[in-house]
Curated annotation (Swiss-Prot):
It comes from the Bacteria. It holds the Pfam family Ribosomal_S7. One of its GO terms (molecular function) is rRNA binding. It comes from Bordetella petrii (strain ATCC BAA-461 / DSM 12804 / CCUG 43448). One of the primary rRNA binding proteins, it binds directly to 16S rRNA where it nucleates assembly of the head domain of the 30S subunit. Is located at the subunit interface close to the decoding center, probably blocks exit of the E-site tRNA. This is Small ribosomal subunit protein uS7. The gene is rpsG.
């Protein structure tokens, strides 16, 4: 256990356009080298594309996509008696959100569209409909946990 006091969590202000804290966090995940204006342009551009392509409310599509991507269980390596076991553990809510956002960003980066806002829009639409690379990452994580269920008694 750490001897120092716990560092308080910084409160993130909601984004100006939609008033969503989750979206503001995602902008921070997309941001590179402290360029928040660029990150905002990418995310808002992607949300405009989502609205144009689906005709649905973009913030709802974003929330649905994030909720679909959030992992419930993951595996952690645990060394027991000279052997490494992949032990399935439940993911804490804060980490769930962080992983979902990171996976969404990485999946969007790897897509083939021309600009990042188009890639992100495509990945958001796919994830909200239960498909795409980010959803595959979640399914793979769950499969790993399911396959290693036998080692769940090593949980610490």
């Amino acid at each position: 256990m750490p001897r120092r006091r716990e560092v308080p969590k910084r409160e993130i202000l909601p984004d100006p356009k939609f008033g969503s804290v989750e979206l503001a966090k995602f902008m921070n995940v997309v941001m590179l080298d402290g360029k928040k204006a660029v990150a905002e342009r990418i995310v808002y551009g992607a949300l405009e594309q989502v609205q144009a392509k689906t005709g649905k409310e973009p913030i709802e599509v974003f929330s649905l996509a994030i909720n679909n991507i959030k992992p419930i269980v993951e595996v952690k390596s645990r060394r027991v008696g000279g052997a490494n076991y992949q032990v399935p553990v439940e993911v804490r809510p804060v980490r769930r959100l962080a992983l979902a956002m990171r996976w969404l960003r990485e999946a969007a980066k790897k897509r083939g569209e021309k600009s990042m806002d188009l890639r992100l829009a495509g990945e958001l639409i796919d994830a909200s409909e239960g498909r795409g690379a980010a959803m595959k990452k979640r399914e793979d994580t769950h499969k790993m946990a399911e396959a290693n269920k036998a080692f769940s008694h090593f949980r610490w």
